[in-house]
């Protein structure tokens, strides 16, 4: 019996002049060239993938690619999920993100926005700080556990994160957002959770203070990105380490954009819930506030909110929760030419970045080339003013939505030397 002949390999037909031979790579039956030399085929070209322009495909392979593209799986990963509702927390307009803003236009808007800010704070130039109290607190349970793990060789940033988490947790405890009564806590939702570090330390503190009590929490971790070195498994191990009589927490991690998130299908029925986040970036804060108030019936079970905000420079006028507050500031200014809301707000976000642009002047200050001709210290103060306007609008909006049974306030939970992004929004029952 004769052995079967080997199937003939299809070799790339590209001829390499320098080596005086054909390319040694394999090709498809339908092509003359391998993938490396396919670009030489005049009948094919690379085009952006319609599902994700960040990568390209051969035009001839488009149909087959669309059936297996990873982006397709991501687009449909939440199909028929009860917690998914497209753009339920976002406000979209036809002209969103279509206007090209030139450098000159932006600088012009900023120069017109600066006097409006100064006018708003003219009665008390430090009003933007004095009305946001510095409320630094320490949680000894968290610090006794975490600080010994941070030796002198660790990145100082790790200790700064721990200090921030300690203050946020103790501020929640002192306002009865975190309680330690039997069955008093069931749902924790961390928005923009990343690795879920804040949830882990909240979990540890509640476990430590729930000895001899029933503890069966549900942590709902929300983030639109994938994350490495997550704390999900460690949160379950912490329960056994701190108290072996307690059940480990239930953890639900969902990769989803907050703009599409309905939280009520995720909550345990008739159980209280707490919303937390540390350094929730830009517009994500506005989307989160809308998510929390999307179904007014959920307010009956809301125990509290703790959101440490950041990155106001990436907020946008369409999705900001309280445009009326900003419009009232524009309208109360006696200027010859008032900017439209969208232009004013865009300038406001850029000015807000000046509050966190470092602790010393830049080269543009040394050369006196900054387009505002303002010194660094004055720009930093204007940045704090702009940030205060954005935060106060959110605070007022949430207070209106939650009603008289809640108190909503802003605090500075650490010194600027620990974090320049040190303002948190707290909501708790009176």
Swiss-Prot record:
Zinc finger (CHHC U11-48K-type): 46-73
Enzyme class: transferase
InterPro entries: Methyltransferase_TRM13, Trm13, TRM13/UPF0224_CHHC_Znf_dom, Znf_CCCH-type_TRM13
UniProt KW keywords: Cytoplasm, Metal-binding, Methyltransferase, Nucleus, S-adenosyl-L-methionine, Transferase, tRNA processing, Zinc, Zinc-finger
Localization terms from the record: Cytoplasm; Nucleus, Nucleolus
Transferase is among the record's keywords: yes
GO process annotations (BP): tRNA nucleoside ribose methylation
GO MF terms, alphabetically ordered: tRNA 2'-O-methyltransferase activity; zinc ion binding
Catalyzed reactions: cytidine(4) in tRNA(Pro) + S-adenosyl-L-methionine = 2'-O-methylcytidine(4) in tRNA(Pro) + S-adenosyl-L-homocysteine + H(+); cytidine(4) in tRNA(Gly)(GCC) + S-adenosyl-L-methionine = 2'-O-methylcytidine(4) in tRNA(Gly)(GCC) + S-adenosyl-L-homocysteine + H(+); adenosine(4) in tRNA(His) + S-adenosyl-L-methionine = 2'-O-methyladenosine(4) in tRNA(His) + S-adenosyl-L-homocysteine + H(+)
Positions with a binding annotation for Zn(2+): 49, 55, 65, 69
Primary location recorded for the protein, binned into one broad class: cytoplasm
Enzyme nomenclature, EC number: 2.1.1.225
Cellular component, GO annotation: cytoplasm; nucleolus
Entry function: tRNA methylase which 2'-O-methylates cytidine(4) in tRNA(Pro) and tRNA(Gly)(GCC), and adenosine(4) in tRNA(His).
Family statement drawn from the similarity comment of this UniProt entry: Belongs to the methyltransferase TRM13 family.
Protein name in UniProt: tRNA:m(4)X modification enzyme TRM13
Organism, scientific name: Vanderwaltozyma polyspora (strain ATCC 22028 / DSM 70294 / BCRC 21397 / CBS 2163 / NBRC 10782 / NRRL Y-8283 / UCD 57-17)
């Amino acid at each position: 019996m004769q052995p079967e002949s080997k199937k003939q390999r299809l070799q790339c037909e590209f001829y390499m002049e320098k080596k005086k031979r054909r390319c040694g790579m394999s090709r498809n039956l339908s092509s003359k060239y391998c993938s490396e030399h396919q670009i030489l085929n005049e009948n094919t070209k690379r085009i952006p993938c319609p599902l994700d322009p960040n990568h390209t495909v051969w035009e001839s392979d488009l149909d087959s690619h669309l059936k297996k593209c990873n982006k397709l799986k991501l687009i449909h990963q939440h199909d028929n999920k009860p917690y998914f509702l497209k753009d339920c927390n976002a406000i979209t307009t036809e002209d969103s993100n279509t206007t090209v803003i030139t450098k000159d236009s932006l600088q012009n808007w900023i120069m017109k926005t600066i006097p409006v800010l100064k006018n708003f704070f003219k009665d008390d130039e430090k009003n933007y700080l004095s009305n946001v109290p510095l409320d630094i607190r320490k949680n000894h349970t968290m610090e006794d556990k975490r600080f010994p793990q941070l030796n002198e060789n660790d990145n100082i940033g790790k200790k700064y994160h721990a200090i921030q988490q300690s203050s946020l947790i103790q501020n929640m405890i002192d306002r009865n957002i975190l309680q330690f009564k039997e069955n008093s806590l069931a749902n924790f939702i961390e928005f923009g959770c990343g690795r879920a570090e804040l949830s882990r330390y909240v979990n540890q503190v509640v476990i430590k203070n729930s000895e001899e009590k029933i503890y069966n929490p549900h942590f709902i971790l929300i983030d639109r990105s994938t994350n490495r070195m997550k704390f999900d498994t460690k949160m379950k191990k912490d329960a056994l380490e701190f108290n072996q009589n307690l059940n480990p927490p239930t953890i639900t991690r969902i990769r989803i954009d907050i703009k599409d998130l309905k939280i009520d299908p995720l909550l345990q029925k008739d159980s209280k819930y707490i919303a937390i986040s540390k350094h929730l970036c830009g517009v994500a804060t506005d989307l989160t506030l809308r998510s929390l108030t999307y179904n007014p019936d959920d307010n009956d079970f809301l125990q509290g909110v703790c959101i440490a905000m950041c990155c106001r420079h990436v907020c946008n006028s369409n999705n900001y929760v309280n445009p009326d507050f900003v419009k009232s500031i524009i309208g109360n200014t006696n200027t010859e030419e008032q900017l439209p809301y969208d232009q004013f707000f865009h300038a406001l976000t850029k000015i807000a970045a000046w509050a966190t642009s470092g602790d010393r002047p830049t080269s543009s200050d040394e050369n006196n080339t900054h387009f505002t001709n303002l010194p660094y210290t004055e720009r930093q103060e204007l940045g704090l003013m702009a940030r205060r306007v954005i935060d106060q609008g959110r605070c007022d909006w949430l207070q209106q939505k939650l009603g008289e049974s809640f108190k909503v306030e802003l605090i500075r939970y650490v010194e600027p030397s620990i974090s320049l992004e040190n303002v948190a929004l707290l909501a708790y029952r009176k």
